Amino acid sequence: MDEILWIWQQKSNNIHDLHSHIWDSWADEEGSIGKAYGYQLGIKHQYKEGMMDQVDRVLFDLKNNPYSRRIMTNIYVHQDLHEMNLYPCAYSMTFNVTKEPGKEKLTLNAILNQRFYRAVRPADSILVSRFSL
């Protein structure tokens, strides 16, 4: 859970913010993993609704157009790969909201897209499945 918050809430690329040694081998002297993970989520872009980073955009879209199939993030940015100390394994997430007919409850669905390597941590294979709103 700490890694999720480090990337999605703090939008950080500095391992010192994580307080874990899992990422040490990819960090430089200052603790940075380069333009990877949280760094990419924190880059602000201009939208007609204003400046937002990817996380802010997901939250905006979930609030204003929750049934869209186009609510997603992507941190595998080709032009920045040479400045990442490691390429992202979990590189994209797609979100949508569903509602069962006749029920009030909404369900947030989140799909994690990930590249698999020989040694994948079991907790990474299915990070998020369904949350109730």
Residue ranges and their predicted role:
Residues 1-133:
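Terminal, non-catalytic protein-protein interaction segments that mediate quaternary/complex assembly
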